[in-house]
């Protein structure tokens, strides 16, 4: 608590930040506060679920910093002394704005508790972007990192690959909030259901709303995953210059790095985890 006070004090944060939250809640999420006109704006970040008591006794809205959506909190109410208690679920290393007094209409309630409908365990057809050494397509019986592949073209691949599969949904889900949880992604993914773009996931919990695209019965699924170009540079470091797939002004070294000052990549450096790692699940959330 002393550390947090010093940190916020160095940023000229007002003392009311610390009075606005319960001491117990302050240890759960990191937070900051500012006023804009008549609005109180709180930014919170952390992991998991907690109930937070705010000094402001008004009606809160929750603003999602990733997609700009504005919703009512999943649960909120008044305390005996007139303050507002809000229940927030930030997931894994998530963030949200809780805003009081802003002239913004919520689009609905924040997603509630999740229940798994299905996990996709069938083999994936994966099509790799051309020009980076990977085969045109491969079949992944289960989701594994590209950098662990026995095929050097996949192992050192950098770029975008499209994972294709399908899933079935039962009847009776019309009007329900459905999403797809991608599990672990390295580094970012776009989701398409039945050919319709649903959203991009680049940070935990790597979950995309598919409510408008999914239907009862068979659904086609495409997940386009992109990584950084680091692995291809490391792979190219072992190749003669004329056989490399990348062009860069960085120096590439065959073997181990000998200098301590960063100036490029060496062929024996550790590869970055890449690809869709899953598990991929279809999720229903209470609204």
Regions found by a protein language model. Give the residues of each.
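Short beta-strand segments within Ig-like beta-sandwich modules, predominantly Fibronectin type-III
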Residues: 77, 198-202
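Short, hydrophobic/aromatic-enriched beta-strand segments in well-ordered soluble domains
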Residues: 96-102, 165, 220-227
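Structural beta-strand segments of beta-rich domains
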Residues: 40, 163, 176-178
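Carbohydrate-binding surfaces of carbohydrate-active enzymes
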Residues: 1-160, 168-172, 210, 281-285
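Glycine/proline-rich low-complexity spacer/linker segments in large multi-domain proteins
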Residues: 103-122, 126, 227-279
């Amino acid at each position: 608590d002393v550390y947090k006070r010093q940190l916020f004090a160095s940023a000229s944060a007002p003392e009311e930040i610390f009075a606005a939250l319960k001491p117990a809640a302050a240890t759960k999420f990191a937070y900051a506060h500012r006023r804009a006109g008549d609005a109180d704006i709180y930014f919170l970040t952390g992991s998991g679920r907690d109930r937070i008591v705010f000094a402001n006794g008004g009606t809160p809205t929750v603003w999602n910093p990733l997609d700009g959506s504005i919703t009512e909190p999943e649960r909120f109410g008044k305390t005996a002394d007139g303050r507002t208690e809000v229940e927030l679920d930030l997931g894994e290393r998530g963030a949200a704005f809780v805003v009081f007094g802003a002239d913004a209409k919520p689009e609905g309630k924040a997603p509630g508790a999740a229940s798994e409908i299905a996990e996709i365990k069938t083999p994936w057809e994966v099509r790799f972007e051309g020009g980076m050494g990977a085969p045109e397509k491969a079949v992944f019986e289960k989701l594994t990192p590209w950098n662990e592949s026995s095929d050097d073209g996949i192992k050192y691949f950098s770029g975008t690959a499209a994972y294709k599969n399908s899933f079935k949904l039962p009847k009776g889900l019309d009007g329900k909030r459905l999403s797809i949880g991608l599990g672990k992604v390295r580094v970012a993914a776009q989701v398409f259901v039945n050919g319709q773009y649903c959203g991009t996931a680049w940070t935990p919990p790597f979950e995309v709303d598919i409510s408008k695209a999914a239907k009862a019965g068979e659904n086609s699924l495409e997940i386009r995953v992109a990584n950084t170009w680091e692995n291809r540079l490391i792979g190219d470091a072992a190749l003669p210059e004329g056989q490399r797939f990348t062009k860069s002004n960085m120096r590439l070294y065959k073997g181990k790095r000998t200098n301590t000052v960063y100036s490029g990549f060496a062929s024996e450096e550790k590869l970055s985890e890449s690809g869709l790692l899953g598990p991929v699940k279809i999720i229903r959330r209470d609204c």
